[in-house]
Amino acid sequence: MDIVKNEFISDLLGIYGKLLTDYQLEIMELYYFEDLSLSEIAIDKDVSRNAIFTLIKRVEKILLDYENKMKLNEKIKKVENKIKDEKLKEDILNILLEGE
């Protein structure tokens, strides 16, 4: 798996994950965060490997569509690049991502 793509999709999951169904989010977390293979997820969920592959590709497209429309990841990266104080940066990102 491409490391840059993996990091990008992981970022998008952190931002837009709550907009996915519970099942979509669970599969994406297993694949991207738990590093399970398509086959391992398919066995665990009692579905075909192709069903998992198709779902992951569909959700990746959904996440990219969200980012193309809302540009939240792009804006977050701009904020990260402008702020030098690491504690302040962390506090701002927590507020942006968690709404606190």
Q: What residue spans do the PLM features occupy?
A:
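Helix-turn-helix DNA-binding elements, focusing on the entry/boundary residues of the two helices
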Residues: 27, 37-39, 45
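Residues within the DNA-recognition helix of helix-turn-helix
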Residues: 55-58
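Short amphipathic alpha helix immediately N-terminal
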Residues: 22-34
